[in-house]
């Protein structure tokens, strides 16, 4: 989709009507026809505050997506939010950069595969611990052909401890 599509406008309207902030992961095509794996930050007034484009592309993603080249901090009700997408979490420098730029919390919309559960567990906890920051990992759930995405979304405290988590396959 493009950033001004009806699809995105519906989410903006939802945020405004319900007074909520939304981090919306999606594929975005820019004005030069480049395609990015992105996340939009939509505020509770229904305005797009900005977007983050995934910087670390996994396996075959390079065939389809352009890599992003910057990390962004979003100020939401005086809370500084960073966003990483999925495989970005595997690179300590990304979370460290956001922390040094003042992030209070990092959200990580993801699509981790069941065979990588141990890495998901380690990365979410380690990035929180090494940066003394909250991590909210939101992992997709479901099956697509032979791809099993296991859920297990979680909130990690700055000590690397799991505060709350959904079970696998939820």
Where are these regions (language model features)?
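CN hydrolase (nitrilase-like) catalytic-core segments centered on the catalytic cysteine
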Residues: 3-23, 90-170
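Recurrent small/Gly-Pro-centered beta-turn motifs in extracellular repeat architectures
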Residues: 26-28
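Active-site catalytic loop in hydrolytic enzyme cores
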Residues: 3, 9, 13, 30-101, ...
């Amino acid at each position: 989709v493009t950033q001004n599509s009806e699809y995105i406008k519906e989410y903006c309207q939802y945020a405004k009507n319900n007074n909520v902030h939304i981090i919306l992961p999606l594929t975005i095509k820019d004005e030069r026809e480049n395609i990015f794996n992105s996340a939009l930050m939509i505020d509770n007034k229904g305005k797009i505050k900005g977007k983050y484009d995934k910087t670390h592309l996994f396996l075959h993603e390079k065939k389809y997506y352009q890599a992003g080249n910057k990390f962004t901090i979003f100020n939401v009700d005086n809370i500084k939010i960073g966003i990483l997408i999925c495989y970005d979490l595997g690179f300590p420098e990304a979370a460290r950069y956001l922390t040094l730029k003042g992030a209070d919390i990092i959200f990580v919309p993801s699509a981790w595969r069941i065979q990588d559960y141990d890495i998901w567990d380690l990365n979410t906890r380690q990035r929180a611990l090494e940066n003394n920051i909250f991590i909210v990992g939101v992992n997709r759930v479901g099956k697509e052909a032979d791809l099993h995405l296991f859920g297990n979304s979680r909130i990690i405290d700055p000590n690397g401890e799991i505060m709350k988590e959904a079970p696998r396959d939820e």
